[in-house]
Amino acid sequence: MTVKVNVENFKKGNIYLQKISDSTLINVDSVFVKKNEPIILKSKIDSPELFYLNLDVSNIENRIEFFGEKGEININTSLEKFNSDFIISGSSTDSIYRTYISVIKKFNNQRLDLIKLSFDLAKIEMNDSLVKIQNQINSLNKRQYLYNLNYVVSNGKSYLSPLIAINEFSDSGKIVLDTIKNSMSNEVLNSKYGKIFNNILKNK
């Protein structure tokens, strides 16, 4: 995998390509940038997986998370809005990931709004309304659970599916996990996240 990066207004400094290996964030490549030189980072990759682009290894909040895959990937951003306004091209899995993230963000924003409302109601002791808000939160959680489950089962050829399964269903019962596994293609099951998911299932 080759990652070509353009960071507007970034004149000088290090830029790092990172990933998670054995639960630890590691640097897989880095380059010292000066005088508007091309930024090219590389990594060996067997199947699509999450990578991170970072300007400061001590600050995990200001990094770009993306799905890497074989081939050439281009990332365009700026120093001022490094991880909040960027464009990624060349990774079909990342395009799918962006769409998924946008849906989950809507769930999270709705949940935060309801939690804030519940705090406000608690201050004025509106207990009946608090119960209604909690019911809405429970309903939202259920809808998100079902969305994730439906997504994974309906997109068995997507390399994103086993990652969602790992993050959202690791604690689920064997029936749910078997259903998820049976929906995945052999290619996906043999990917990095597919193998991790399969190990979770074997330990049930």
Question: For the regions a protein language model found, what residue spans apply to each?
Answer:
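Start-of-domain marker
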Residues: 1-81
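TPR/TPR-like alpha-solenoid helical repeat scaffolds
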Residues: 170-171, 194-204
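Generic alpha-helical secondary structure signal
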Residues: 14, 101-104, 197
